[in-house]
């Protein structure tokens, strides 16, 4: 949770009392209020694909202050912030680590959903997998009477899934400075599961292989848990990511040991450590990292001894910061900013070198969460965790896109665990939504289809009699989540629309929309109506990312300043 001074609290009460900035985005789907990206570096030379995010409020709502996003959950967005799919209420409770993957030859989505304990950085629940129609096809839980944690689910070879578990257990912790009554420690566990059956194929327990001597944060003063009870167990290791190589070995990121470990996939022994108190490698300039997240192999050791040059390349997100979530100790910083990193290790020379670093445009340093995804073309998508921002970099480290995950007043306090870019084809099972709204000058029809990626044109028809006869009204190119067609000078009492793909085929039709009077939003404090943006014509949307006015312009500047400096 972010630090709040009395001045910030007083100001936030003023700024956040009105959460209506999330409203009025879609006439056909007024129930949806997705975050509006605040884009400070518009996309240029980014790689193909959509953005996959699951932002949530890092600050609690109070009677006088409400925080963004108003609808926390998984989202698929375009680079301009336009909504593709809202997973709000489809993934219920609290959802994170939202991604696309392949399972048994099928394109799928998955996300953790369950309980979120922000103070301890843990969560307990299950992994839910959706198909291309956004229907649930699998829920996956941990085996051996354990609970899945929120941090990791990673699909391997389209068949198995890697998960991570926090298991509090009682131990004698006095050798590490504990009082006799401080008896609880977290046993950090990984499992590999058969996704189809849930069968446990491999399990590894940190206390069987890693001594608490490797902990960076001691049990006292309790910054990583005090150990007095199972809910406050000492989290000495804190696994937050797992990967697997072609030889069956595992790569784990242990945040509270500031180290990445390679684990033998047969007996669980540690093959090497990168970083921490007992590194197997001498760290070159810029390699040093701490409190990291999201370690992934980019290239692996060969299983052919003749071809093996001893080199392996990994990516990770270097937080270089740890917060005070347990209300004990102080915030720890090991570098001026967080960063994404590509690191090469050489098991023959015992050296590690920095291949490339990716540093934040706004000097961001996230005390929790974060991810680094190296994209197929060499770009890197770095998510800044508790700072609620995402950046895409060219391979040389030049930022080509940067955005915060909500705008105006609602941008304050937004966080996001991981962010990704994936190609995706969405074919929703639900029918498209349509509304027909009348004003003094005529009728406007609005249509949208949550999750659809294939519609290129919308065709609109008037239903002219009780038998369902249809009269063509016109068509509009689909340029965003919602498309509109203006019918000037007359009422359209009943209307339908058809989604048409790039080959001219009809994908799906809507139900019948009966005409309603158009209600326009009242601008804050002005007592006047403001026009709704003509979404189908691609006109600028008032209050959209980078286009805030008046009070919101001031608040956006204030928030940006706070993000950059930490000072008011």
Residue ranges and their predicted role:
Residues 1-22, 568:
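Fungal secretory targeting signals
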């Amino acid at each position: 949770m972010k630090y709040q001074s009395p001045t910030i609290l007083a100001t936030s009460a003023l700024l956040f009392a009105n959460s209506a900035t999330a409203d009025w985005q879609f006439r056909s789907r007024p129930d949806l209020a997705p975050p509006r990206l605040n884009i400070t570096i518009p996309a240029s030379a980014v790689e193909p694909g959509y953005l996959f995010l699951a932002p949530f409020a890092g600050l609690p709502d109070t009677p006088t202050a409400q925080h963004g996003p108003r609808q926390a959950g998984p989202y698929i967005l375009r680079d301009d912030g336009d909504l593709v799919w809202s997973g709000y209420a489809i993934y219920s409770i609290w959802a994170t680590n939202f991604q696309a993957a392949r399972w048994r030859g099928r394109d799928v989505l998955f996300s953790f959903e369950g309980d979120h304990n922000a103070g301890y950085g843990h969560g307990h629940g299950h992994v839910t997998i959706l198909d291309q129609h956004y229907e649930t096809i699998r829920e996956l839980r941990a085996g051996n009477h354990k609970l899945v944690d929120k941090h990791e689910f990673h699909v391997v070879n389209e068949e198995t899934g890697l998960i991570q578990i926090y298991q509090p257990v009682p131990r004698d912790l006095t050798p590490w400075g504990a009082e006799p009554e401080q008896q609880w420690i977290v046993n950090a566990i990984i499992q590999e599961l058969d996704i189809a059956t849930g069968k446990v194929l491999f399990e590894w327990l940190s206390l069987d292989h890693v001594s608490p001597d490797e902990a960076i944060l001691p049990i006292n003063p309790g910054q990583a848990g005090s150990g007095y009870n199972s809910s406050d167990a000492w989290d000495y290791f804190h696994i937050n990511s797992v990967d697997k190589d072609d030889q069956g070995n595992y790569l784990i990121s242990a945040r509270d040991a500031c180290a990445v470990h390679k684990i033998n996939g047969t007996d669980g022994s540690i093959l090497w450590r990168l970083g921490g108190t007992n590194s197997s490698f001498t760290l070159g300039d810029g390699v040093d990292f701490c409190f990291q997240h999201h370690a992934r192999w980019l290239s692996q050791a060969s299983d052919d001894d003749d071809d093996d040059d001893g080199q392996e390349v990994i990516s990770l997100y270097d937080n270089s910061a740890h917060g005070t979530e347990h209300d004990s100790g102080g915030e720890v910083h090991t570098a001026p900013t967080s960063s994404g990193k590509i690191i090469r290790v050489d098991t023959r020379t015992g050296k590690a070198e920095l291949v490339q670093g990716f540093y934040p445009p706004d000097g961001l340093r996230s005390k929790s969460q974060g991810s680094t995804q190296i994209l197929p073309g060499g770009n890197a998508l770095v998510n800044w965790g508790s700072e609620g921002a995402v950046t895409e970099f060219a391979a040389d480290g030049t930022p080509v896109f940067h955005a915060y995950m909500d705008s105006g007043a609602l941008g304050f306090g937004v966080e996001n665990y991981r962010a990704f870019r994936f190609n995706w084809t969405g074919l929703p099972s639900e029918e498209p939504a349509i509304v027909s709204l009348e004003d003094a000058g005529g009728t406007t029809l609005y249509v949208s289809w949550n999750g659809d990626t294939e519609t290129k044109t919308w065709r609109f028809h008037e239903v002219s009699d009780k038998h369902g006869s249809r009269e063509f009204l016109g068509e509009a190119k689909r340029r965003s989540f919602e498309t509109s067609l203006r019918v000037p000078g007359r009422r359209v009492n009943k209307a339908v629309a058809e989604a048409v793909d790039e080959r001219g085929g009809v994908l799906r039709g809507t139900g019948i929309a009966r005409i309603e009077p158009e209600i326009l939003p009242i601008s804050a404090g002005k007592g006047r109506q403001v026009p709704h943006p003509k979404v189908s014509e691609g006109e600028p949307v008032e209050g959209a990312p980078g286009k805030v006015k008046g009070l919101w312009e001031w608040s956006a500047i204030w928030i940006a300043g706070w993000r950059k400096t930490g000072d008011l």
